[in-house]
Amino acid sequence: MLKIQEMMQIALMTAIMGILGLIPPIFFTFTPVPITLQTAGLLLAGGLLKPKQAWMSLLLFLLIVAAGAPLLSGGRGGIGVFFGPSGGFLLAYPIAAFVISWWLNRLKKMTALRLFAVYALCSIGILYICGVPFQAMMMHIEVKQAALLSMIYVPGDLIKAGICSVFTVKIIQAMSYRKREIHKGGRAI
């Protein structure tokens, strides 16, 4: 059974994913998969939540999108988005968030550099392993060709991984400080 605080964290991360969907995507003429900031939300979910919570927040987000809410970048929503070229990437979101969180929970010390490595490996590795073959199938092209088309996204994914790793460390430090203040009798504002 989830605690209320855990449910709130799941809901908050789901809302953040929806808010990031309001930022317009960047499309290229040669590939139908857009560049979005929602992968940054995936990274933050994995970095800030427990594995089960991270998985649940992204699954909840995808269920809301499947129900028709236009929360994906560009106002996309509905079950049809999962049968398009970006469907494999989307379906990999909960898996990637879970693996990121699971991996980070096993680190003895969390630094921005270690976070960056985990974020980059998981976001590029898991999302592309699931997304590229699905994209190839939907576009009726070879997997090798889809992989080459997807290489345009790697620099942006690395930039997002770097920015999110710094944000995650700062958020965790702020939360740890806040917890110390509460335990000392300070006010939680």
Question: What do the predicted segments below correspond to?
Answer:
Residues M1-W55:
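Hydrophobic transmembrane alpha-helices
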Residues M7-L12, T36, A40, L44, ...:
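Hydrophobic alpha-helical transmembrane segments
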Residues A11, A15, I19, A40, ...:
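Generic alpha-helical transmembrane segments of integral inner-membrane proteins
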